[in-house]
Amino acid sequence: MRFIHIADVHLGMQPDAGFPWSEERGEAIWESFRRIIRLASREKTDFLLIAGDLFQRQPLLRELKEVNDLFASIPETIVVLIAGNHDYVKRESFYRGFDWADNVVMLLSPEPECVEVPEKRTAVYGCSYDKKEILENRLDGVRQEGKMKYHLLLAHGGDARHMPWNPGRMAQAGFDYIACGHIHKPGILIPCLLYTSDAADE
């Protein structure tokens, strides 16, 4: 299986707001994301995993449509995403009810849920933020289950105010790969299992 794991892209961010170069830097973030889509197409990846904060804020409908068009351009890649603390799913969020391309699955629930992709023999688990801060570990107790060969988990947080979790306990949950977001620093928390990602500077 081949997949790309990203998080904290923060589309819609305007770095250095008020300065002449701010708009250009904001567009550079979008272009970084487009490069990831092109990479997924070129490498024919099975999955694109997005572990929260694809957007810097509540996404505009036109922004969701632009992102969805990019996802639709890689129909052989299954895109699975969750919302993080910046783009959390508010009651009036455009995330709710959005008509994603056929190859896209958003795990909208604030509680852990699972999507099975039989043709890839893979199950992907995760949950989205429904508010800016989540003080409890909603992933505590989530375990891989079912008959799929591969089990992947999307997780966003890891500090005291954003779904605090214990890496050691997560390692015992039976997942083949845990794709983390929020840390803003790529790294390996547990070798061969628990990884953080930051796509903003790709």
Model segments located where?
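Conserved catalytic scaffold of divalent metal-dependent phosphoesterases
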Residues: 67, 87-169, 173, 177
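Extreme N-terminal starter segment of soluble prokaryotic enzymes
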Residues: 1-4
